[in-house]
Amino acid sequence: MTAKLDRPATRDGLFLWVMHRFAEVFEEHAVIKGGMVLKLLDSPRDTVDIDYIFVPFSSKKEIVGRIEEVLREIEDAVIEIELHSKMLRAGLRVDDAAIVIEANVATECQTVPMATGGFARSVGHPSQIVRIMSPSVSLAHKIAAWNERRLLRDLYDCYFLASRAGASPDLNVLDLRLAKMQSRLPGLKKLHRMSRRRLVDELLQATAQLSDADLESELAGILPPEELAGLAIRIRVSVERITTILLGDQDN
């Protein structure tokens, strides 16, 4: 085992240990997704959990025992694992630090290798190579997540992936998500599918009147002040670029 954990543990130290150790144990089968992908792409957005997709598996029960076994390698770790219908949730507490690991499974997922780079160095450890969900697939899922939840956090993540990471959404993945919408919002929960054309209208309407004050009220706890300044117009420009791509296929 080459993954190291300094004690007393810190939250970022736990994140890094999980990323490095999972890469050692599960190799290309453990794929990081969600907010930690943005963190590895140098996003300043804070995150309190780390999301994984394990491939190629058909059931979370196939991985739960191995995940717990790996986490118990940490001396005196407090581990709580729950299996939900849509995910496996593992709480990990070491010393005074705690993180949450959320995982689900899939038979396939487009991935790319990524160095833990600056994040690892910020914790005082050398970089290692991990697997992350392809940024284009991540962007497609983030657009779909915004559509179902309407959170400004998701809109920021779309902006970051498109403008700062240079990703274009995987339209096949997005179309699959739009074809089986699952929203709990009152105005959307009865809607089970959406066209790209309507999604574009919803995105443009949401960003047309977006202000820095709106973003600050929701994102001040997870973004530094220098990232919030002028963010509304940056998101608006990015969303306009995304919608142009979404409308590129005239059949949708």
Where are these regions (language model features)?
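Structured mid-to-C-terminal alpha-helical surface segments
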Residues: 1-31, 38-50, 54-252
